[in-house]
């Protein structure tokens, strides 16, 4: 049995375009990415030790004939919480190409908080409390710390930075740049290139009424007889919208103090304009 391992990784950051890019890249005929977007194999010690390399390699077997084989565990960039990810990447995949998606810090934090509400992460429901106490919101936004850690293992030429705003504004250019970086035909254009995926603004939160109905026999019948558009209508009515984040001046200043130096470091290391995110530095 031929052993197939990835030769590129989308390392994060969450809520910075990783799902959109994963969706688009896996449509390319010379690229394979498994249906499981985020294996978390190299970051989470429990998965690494219990599942083992045979499980991980099975994910990529269908891509044996593809030039580029990759995965998109967005937590790999969170080097403060998952330091083993960069170590394992450097040890087992020294020639891999890394794509690092980043987003304006305040926007990424807000979007990540909304995603956590939808997925019911155990964190304070109040936005300000969550930002101050749920470490992943801030630590996933320490772009400078993360890039510095990866540059200690990989040369800069093997790391490609993707800006969320540029992916949104000029997807053809950004997508083509990623294809060139991965060494595959850059002329391929997916039919849905301009459509964003996994938008927090489109998400809604499960309510007790929705959960109760979801498990009931009328719901099982409805799933069989109702057309998809009508099912989506009822689901949307039974779920509640995600709350809006409230940025008080005090909270904004707290985040600025936490991330300002790190953001400056990232912009310098990445070779980006120091005024790219003026609100955060």
Locate the predicted segments by residue.
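Anion-recognition interface
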Residues: 1-281
């Amino acid at each position: 049995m031929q052993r197939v391992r990835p030769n590129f990784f989308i390392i994060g950051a969450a809520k910075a375009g990783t799902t959109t890019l994963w969706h688009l890249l896996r449509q390319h005929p010379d690229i394979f990415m498994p249906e499981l977007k985020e294996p978390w194999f190299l970051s989470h010690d429990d998965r690494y030790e219990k599942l083992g390399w045979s499980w991980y390699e099975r994910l990529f077997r269908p891509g044996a004939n593809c030039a580029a084989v990759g995965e998109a565990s967005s937590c790999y960039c969170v080097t403060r919480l998952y330091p083993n990810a960069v170590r394992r990447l450097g040890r087992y995949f020294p020639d891999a190409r890394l794509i690092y998606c980043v987003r304006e810090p305040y926007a990424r934090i807000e979007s990540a908080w909304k995603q956590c509400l939808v997925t019911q992460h155990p964190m304070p429901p109040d936005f300000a409390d969550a930002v101050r106490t749920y470490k992943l919101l801030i630590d996933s936004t320490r772009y400078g710390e993360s890039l510095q850690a990866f540059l200690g293992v990989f040369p800069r030429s093997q790391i490609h930075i993707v800006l969320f705003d540029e992916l949104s504004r000029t997807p053809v250019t950004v997508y083509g740049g990623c294809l060139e970086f991965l060494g595959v035909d850059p002329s391929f254009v997916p039919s849905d290139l301009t459509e964003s995926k996994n938008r927090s603004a489109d998400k809604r939160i499960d309510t007790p009424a929705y959960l109760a109905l979801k498990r009931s026999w009328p719901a099982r019948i409805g799933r069989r007889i109702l057309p998809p558009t009508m099912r989506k209508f009822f689901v949307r009515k039974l779920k509640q919208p995600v709350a809006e984040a409230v940025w008080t001046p005090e909270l904004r200043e707290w985040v600025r103090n936490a991330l300002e130096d790190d953001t400056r470091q990232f912009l310098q290391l990445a070779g980006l304009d120091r005024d790219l995110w003026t609100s955060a530095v």
